[in-house]
Amino acid sequence: MPGWLAVPRDWLASLGEIARFCGRTMGLVYSGRVLQFFGEALRQAGILITGSALVIWGLVFILGLSSCGIEAAYLNRSLGAPAYAGVFSAWCDLREVVPYAFGYMMSAKVGTGIVAELGAMRISDEIDALEVMGVPPMVFLAATRLLAAWMVFPFLFLSSVGIAFFASWLAVVKQIGDVSSGGYFLIFWMFQNPPDLLFSLIKGMAISTAIVLVGCYYGYTASGGPVGVGTATAKSMVLNIVLVHVISMMGTLVFWGANPRAPIGG
């Protein structure tokens, strides 16, 4: 095989290994085998809440305040339609900013943390010790973390959306004051509906699931000592950032590409 095909071949091989690992992990959750370690899943869920919630909420508050609040208010003022600042809050926060911010922080905080923890266990032979003791490591280490993510992330995502909405309202109504609270919410709810919230939640859960699975894969398969764990952490971060953009783009195209669900036109 020509040398220039070596890199694409290695990439495809790695993607195949990741896909197989993800399929096995999800199968362990769907089959119910992970329930034998439900206590560990609850422990991981608690770690996710206490270690990530405030960081994610803080990020979406800042983005909702600035990107979807202040900028939207001044843009609408320049267009002569300050009363329509709620449009940007309804669309910007829910459809794009919160899913992207959620994915970025999950990649940087949760994904890399999983790689570092599992990688340290791998190079110190703790995973091999689990096998010797008769504990299935894939179930105990990977499937429990995925189940914990599915228990926690819907709450984290929906609460993040609410915080972003509050931040945008705070910027538009209280800080800039171009529109009253009643006028703001009139337009805000005209451009938003329950299916949009469901679609955004699906995007967020797809992104979160991919991040956790990638983190588990790179941590579980780490090798080469501390340097290898660092390399695996960097690889997981790069892949997760790519997946955040790809999944969010595909979600936007599927859910709103053909029908933006906007009360405009005839």
Predicted regions and their residues:
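Short, membrane-interfacial amphipathic segments enriched in basic
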Residues: 1-40, 218-223
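Active-site cofactor/substrate anionic-group-binding motifs, chiefly glycine-
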Residues: 48-101, 105
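Selective transmembrane-helix segments that form parts of the transport pathway or gating/packing helices
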Residues: 49, 53, 57, 97, ...
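Hydrophobic alpha-helical segments of membrane proteins
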Residues: 53-65, 69, 150, 154, ...
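Membrane-interfacial helix-loop-helix connectors in multipass membrane proteins
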Residues: 70-94, 163-205, 214-235, 258-266
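Hydrophobic alpha-helical transmembrane segments of multi-pass membrane transport proteins
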Residues: 85-128, 214
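Short cytoplasmic-facing helical segments at TM-TM junctions of multi-pass membrane proteins
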Residues: 118-143, 226-229
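C-terminal transmembrane helix-loop-helix hairpin of multi-pass membrane proteins
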Residues: 227, 231-249
